[in-house]
Amino acid sequence: VTSGAADVLRLLTVRGETLAVAESLTGGLVAAEIASVPGASKAFRGSVTAYATDVKRDVLGVEGTLLAERGAVDPQVAAQMAAGVRRLLRADWGIATTGVAGPEPQDGQPVGTVFVAVDGPFETVFGEPGGEKVTSLRLNGDRTEIRMESVRSVLALLLEELAGEQTGNERAQDTERNGGT
């Protein structure tokens, strides 16, 4: 898994940007993975393990009505966790994990239902702030496998956003440079 964390940190460091992590089902595994990379302190601000529902609400600012209506395993909850930890720890990027590692279903969701989210300085095509990205996963395996795959998935989602933004910028520069000749 560490290569994903190393790639994320390399891109963040190059960009001079920072990361905060909010975790539920992964219980600190994402933060541990990031912190295991030498030089992580250049970009990693910290994390909140919001395992209990009231911590998601009271610390990360997830809407109480959303939690009451949908439960903690929900794409909007993941999005609000990522936005909340980003705001709380004053980071450029926030990532979050919430889901059901098992062995029992939770909030009406089957084991292996996981939502990972990224919140960051996105821009839409019109240059407006673009909010957050959430990925819905249906994972197989035991509790440990589901948690480890959730770590890989949230880091991959962030890496995709970081690399995508960089690629987009490079393409735009190429187009300008070669435009009209």
Model-derived segments and spans:
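Short alpha-helical segments enriched in small residues
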Residues: 1-181
